[in-house]
Amino acid sequence: MLDLSHRRVGVFIDVQNMYYSARNIYGSKVNFGNIVLKTLGDQRLVRAIAYTVSTKTGEELPFFEALHKMGIEVNTKELLEYDSGHKKGDWDVGITVDIIRMLDMLDVVVIVSGDGDYVPLGEYVKNRGRIFHVASFRESTSSKLVECADVYTNFSDDLPSFLINDPKYRPTPNTKSSAVDTFDDVIAEQQQKEHVELPKPAPKSDQPRRRGRKTNL
């Protein structure tokens, strides 16, 4: 059996992409702790980072705290609101920059998203001799992103591991994602789940300085 314990892995989670995929397709919530555990396997965790937005109300803070308790770092950016009423809070550029900066300390990059904007990143990661692992719900994933991946994990093949069912939820396939939503409906479920123990990440001395903002709870 192949020993994978030496492989250094970074898991980068596009929270909103996962949240809306699970809600719109399955009417369910995401088990973020299991996403990290299942994509990591027997490999060595260096960093597990969730990227999301913060709002003026602060209602999402309990959700961030739940992720912290699972051993997942949380990076946030403020929701941008324009005079036109348009709101923007996507993280694709920020995630890409972080991965490029951390690449020297990783053997495997796990991008948890179905967004086709990560295809150029995947090509770069592979050209640098690293493994590009994509994990997502196939129904909401770009075919080009799947083709680009060295390894692809389809959460839809093992829904009990990656979803938290809620009888009050119903699939809403025609609902458009909005950066203003703040995840209050997933907070209680994440907090009530059994504590997920993630492998200890590498010591801070082995890691580059973190860019951007991290939530302080």
What are these regions (language model features)?
Residues M1-L217:
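Terminal and domain-boundary accessory regions
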